[in-house]
Amino acid sequence: MAVVRDASENVKDSEMLRRTVLYDKYTEIHKFWKSYGIKKPARCAFFKLPVGGAVGSHIDDGTYYLKKDRYHLSLQGKYKYECNGEEHIIEPGTFFWFSNKLTHSALNVGDVDRITFVFDVPHNKNNP
């Protein structure tokens, strides 16, 4: 979880992290990270997008993102993902990296809620 010292700080510029009380309960996620050699994940979250829902075009700005790689693991639902003008249909089970420093968006084109696990890791040439 992202942490700031006080309300005047922008979370997008904070490198501080705190594990949530549930962090150690997600044993399958830890196994998944280990299978890809990911030892120090940064921020991570599960996101739900309802049928027909969209995440509008945006860039993840702020100093936090400058040295992080962003990954998605699609768990449920089918969605259209667009990054820098390139579109892909993402099916459950798809694991991918993309540059969140470029314009990106998502649209749930499936018939169930999209559930995706999104996480960042410090940039490293050995990342998946």
Predicted regions and their residues:
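A short hydrophobic beta-strand segment most commonly corresponding to one strand
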Residues: D69-S74, F95-W97, D111-P128
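Non-heme Fe(II)/2-oxoglutarate
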Residues: M1-I38
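Catalytic phosphate/metal-binding cores of nucleic-acid and nucleotide-processing enzymes, i.e., regions
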Residues: K12-S14, K40, I89-E91, K125-P128
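Histidine-centered catalytic micro-motifs
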Residues: A54-G62
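A short beta-strand-loop-beta hairpin characteristic of the jelly-roll/cupin
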Residues: G56, H72-P92
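A short glycine-rich, His/Asp/Glu-containing loop-to-beta-strand
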Residues: K31-V55
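Short, conserved beta-strand element in jelly-roll/cupin
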Residues: K48, T63-K80
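Conserved metal-binding segment of the jelly-roll/cupin
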Residues: I89-H104
